[in-house]
Amino acid sequence: MAQTVRECSLALLFLFMWLLIKANIDVCKLGTVTVQPAPVIPLGSAANISCSLNPKQGCSHYPSSNELILLKFVNDVLVENLHGKKVHDHTGHSSTFQVTNLSLGMTLFVCKLNCSNSQKKPPVPVCGVEISVGVAPEPPQNISCVQEGENGTVACSWNSGKVTYLKTNYTLQLSGPNNLTCQKQCFSDNRQNCNRLDLGINLSPDLAESRFIVRVTAINDLGNSSSLPHTFTFLDIVIPLPPWDIRINFLNASGSRGTLQWEDEGQVVLNQLRYQPLNSTSWNMVNATNAKGKYDLRDLRPFTEYEFQISSKLHLSGGSWSNWSESLRTRTPEEEPVGILDIWYMKQDIDYDRQQISLFWKSLNPSEARGKILHYQVTLQEVTKKTTLQNTTRHTSWTRVIPRTGAWTASVSAANSKGASAPTHINIVDLCGTGLLAPHQVSAKSENMDNILVTWQPPKKADSAVREYIVEWRALQPGSITKFPPHWLRIPPDNMSALISENIKPYICYEIRVHALSESQGGCSSIRGDSKHKAPVSGPHITAITEKKERLFISWTHIPFPEQRGCILHYRIYWKERDSTAQPELCEIQYRRSQNSHPISSLQPRVTYVLWMTAVTAAGESPQGNEREFCPQGKANWKAFVISSICIAIITVGTFSIRYFRQKAFTLLSTLKPQWYSRTIPDPANSTWVKKYPILEEKIQLPTDNLLMAWPTPEEPEPLIIHEVLYHMIPVVRQPYYFKRGQGFQGYSTSKQDAMYIANPQATGTLTAETRQLVNLYKVLESRDPDSKLANLTSPLTVTPVNYLPSHEGYLPSNIEDLSPHEADPTDSFDLEHQHISLSIFASSSLRPLIFGGERLTLDRLKMGYDSLMSNEA
C-alpha cells in the first residue's frame, strides 16, 4: 500500500513538472535547464545538465550568494516529501553537471535557487528537464496471422522482443495479389504494449491459392527495425468457427450407442470429436471426414455421464483446426447389470438350535451396474429340506435367524430398471470350524496413514485344499454390525499377503481375520492392527473392587473409543499402600474386549491400598485412570484353625489321660459350682418300681423274671452312685450285674478297680451263716445306661433296715458316725474319696438333699434277701 502511494506521488510530481516545462509558464521565469547531447539517451550513456539564471534574476539582496541546487527524482529512490535527491550545488548564475549511470526509464532533474542559509525559507525552483534512458527496438519475430471463419478479418500477432522503455511505434503491412496493400499502426510505452493488430480486411475463398506477405516495423528515438517477411495463403490463416448446436440421440434407448449431431460452416471437410466420462482424465478421440454434422458412437458406457466436444477444419491436409466447441454433458441410458456381486457373511449362534446369518455384499461399480440399482434380491436356501427364504432390500446387508441344522446356501442379485444381474451363490459353512485350515503367523504392519499390510503362512492342511483366502477387517468400535459392517478382500491361494486400504483411518484399531476356505470347510486366525497409533488419552475407569475368597476382583470400564488412539495391547493395574512413597506394584493384563475384571491375590489384609489402571499401545502408556482406595478384610485361615484345634485336642486328651491331672482338674471344676445349684437326690418311694409292687412289712417278694428287666427304666431319674460304708473294710467285687433266667447268680471275678470296703459292726469271725448270707450293706449303685443289665451274683443279696442320712455322694449308713477313723486305711480312703468326684463345675457344698413332706419310703424299711428272690422265682 505504501509503495503504491509513493509511486502515485512521484507520477503526479512528474506530470506536474512536465506540464510546467511544456507550458513554459512561471516556473521557469528564473532561468533555464538544458541537457546535452539529448533528452533521450541509450543505456550507459552520460548527459550534461546545465542550469542558468535569466538576467536580473537571482538573490536580490545578495547577488553574489546565488546557490544553484540540482535535485534528482527517480522511480526507484525513496524521496521523502518529494524534495528529491541532491546531486549537485554551485554558487553563481549558472552551473553544469554531468550525470552518469542513469537507470532505464525516465529521470527528472530540477534546478533550485537557494538565497538564504536559513532552513526557514525553502529553495525556489528555477526549471527542470527529463532524461529518458532506453534501447533501440529489436526486429519483431514469430509473426502469425489468422482469419476466424469465412467472414472474419485478418489479424496478425508478433513477438516485440526486449522492452525499449521508450515510446515505440509498430507498423503492420500486408501485401497480396492485385496490388493489395494494407497497413495498421500501434505504439508501446510504459502503459501499454503493442504486439497484435487487426487489419480489418476479409480474405475470401476465391483467393484460396493466392499468397500474401506481411511485415512489422518498429521505430523509436534510438532507432528502428523490421521483421522478416511472412508469407501465407488463405487456407493457412483461415480457422473455421467452432461447431455449435451439439446434441446426441440414443438409438432405441440404448446406453452404449448414440448419434452425435452438430452445426458447422459449409467449407468444413474434417471434424474431430472427443468425449470422456466426467470422472476420467483421458479423452477418446475420433476423426470424421465429411461428417456433415453427424456421427455414430458405439462404445459408450450405459448410465454414464459423458462430456462431448467437436472441432472443425477446412482442408484435409492443410489449414488449422477450429477451437473446441462448447461442451455437451449428458448421461447415457440404463441397461441391465452385468456384474457379479461380491458376497460375504458372518455367523453367530443364538441358542442350541438357532443361528443368525448376516449377509454382506459390495455394490457394483458403475460400469457393472449400468444403471441405478433399485434393490437386491436375497435368497437363503436349505439344500436338503428345500426350504427357501427370500427377501428384497435396498441395503447392502441382510440378517436372518435360521436353524443350526442343515446345509445352507445364499445368493444375491442386483436389479435396476432394465433387469437384474446374475445371482452370486455362496455356501454357508463354519468359517472358523476347522483348525487344520487356520492360517499361521498372521501379522499386521502399518505401512502408512491409510493402509495396513497383512501377512500370513499357509495352514497345516495341504495347500491344494485352500480354494481362496479372505482377509476381513472391521473397526473395533461400539455399534451394531450393520452400522459398522466388515470389509474384505479375496486373495488367490498362492498369495500370502494383502494390503488393506478400504476405509482404513489412523488411530483406529481394527480386528483383522484371515480365512482359509475350501469347498466345504473354513479355518481362520485373527489379529488386531492399526495404521497409526499414539498413547491413549486416558486410562480405564475402575468401577468396583470386591473381595471374594481371599482375592480382590477389580472391575473397570473400557476407555472410550475416540480416546484409545490405536490398538490397546495391555492393561496395567497398579497398587501401593496408602501414604507410601515406595514404587507401586503392578499387574499386566492382556487386552481383551470382553474382559472388564481381573483378580489380584497379593494384597495384605487390613491394609489400605490405592489402586489405579493404565492402558498401553505400541506408542506408549496412557495417563493413569481414577484412583480407588480399598482395605482387604481377609479371612480366617481355616487350615491354621484346624491344625491348632487338633493340637489343643491332642494336648487336652494327653493331659486328662493321666489320673492325677484329671482328678486335680475335676476338683478345681467342682469348686466352681454356684451355691444356688443343688443336685436333687431322688427318693426311692417315688420310683416306678415301688409303685408297681406293694411294700411288705419285712420284705418285698420279687419275681426273678423281673430282675431281667432294664434297670433303671427311661422314666426313672438318673441313677446315683451310693457308697457302701462298713465298720470293717471287706473287699467286695463291683461289676455290672447280669443274671439269666434259670441260672441264678453266678460268681464273678474281682478286680482292683472294682474292690470296695464294707463296714460291719460285728466282728468278722462272729458272723453266723445267715448273717454272712444276709450281710446288711448298702450297695453302691452306679449310673448306668438304660440298657445296662444286672450281672450274676455269687452271694445272696439281703437288704436290712438301717437308719440313713442322704448325702451328696449317695446313701450312707445311719451309723457312719460310729466308724472309727483308725479302722479305715488312709490309702484306701483316699482312693475311695477320689473315685466318685463330681464332674460338675459348681461347688459341691451347694448341693442339698431333696426333702419331701409326709411319709416316705426309706432304705431302713427295706429288707431284701436271696431267699425272697428265690421264693419269688419259684
UniProtKB/Swiss-Prot annotation:
Keywords linked to the UniProt accession: Disulfide bond, Glycoprotein, Membrane, Phosphoprotein, Receptor, Repeat, Signal, Transmembrane, Transmembrane helix
| Expression triggers | Following T-cell activation, expression inhibited by IL4 and induced by IFN gamma.
Superkingdom of the organism of origin: Eukaryota
* Motif window: Box 1 motif: 677-685
Keyword hit for Transmembrane helix: yes
Membrane topology type, per the record? Single-pass type I membrane protein
Pfam families the UniProt entry points to? fn3, Lep_receptor_Ig
**Motif WSXWS motif in this chain:** 321-325
Topological domains (Cytoplasmic): residue ranges?
Answer: 659-874
User: Post-translational modification, briefly?
Assistant: On IL12 stimulation, phosphorylated on C-terminal tyrosine residues. Phosphorylation of any one of Tyr-757, Tyr-804 or Tyr-811 can activate STAT4, IFN-gamma production, and T-cell proliferation. Tyr-811 is the dominant site of cell proliferation.
CDD domains cross-referenced by the UniProt entry: FN3
| Resulting phenotype, Y727F | No loss of IL12-induced STAT4 activation nor T-cell proliferation. No effect on IFN-gamma production
Query: Any keyword Membrane?
Result: yes
Q: Name one GO molecular function term.
A: protein kinase binding
PANTHER family xrefs:
INTERLEUKIN-27 RECEPTOR SUBUNIT ALPHA
Q: Which family does it belong to?
A: Belongs to the type I cytokine receptor family. Type 2 subfamily.
- State the remark under miscellaneous: Lps-defective mice C57BL/10ScCr (Cr) mice carry a mutation in the IL12RB2 gene leading to the production of a truncated IL12 receptor beta 2 chain resulting in malfunction of the IL12-mediated IFN-gamma response.
State the name under which the record lists this protein: Interleukin-12 receptor subunit beta-2
Q: Which organism is it from?
A: Mus musculus
Higher taxonomy: Eukaryota, Metazoa, Chordata, Craniata, Vertebrata
